[in-house]
Amino acid sequence: MNIHIWPYNWGWAPKDRLQENLEKAKQNSKVYIDEHLAVAKKYQKPLVMEEFGYPRDNFQFSKSSSVKARDAYYKYIFDLVLDNASSHTLFAGCNFWGWGGFANPSERI
């Protein structure tokens, strides 16, 4: 089984309140993962979070913009993956989606 988690896209963290909604995004992500782990357990299938992400602070796309909230969100997700791996649950791993990557964003937003 695989899941995606996009707190901004799903309305858990509006672009003008990313830092303020970080805890809500974490809590909703945990609930979403746990719900899908229950389904994975029912069918005895591993669960992979194949795609997730969190925007840069202030919804900026510049490579030099701050990523404090995103770093905190990623740490939370990676800690969940590590905790589940240590407990030998069906949560098999994750990938993350890199916003900005090698592309050069337009300064026109």
Label every PLM stretch briefly.
Residues 1-109:
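Substrate-binding clefts and catalytic carboxylate motifs of secreted carbohydrate-active enzymes
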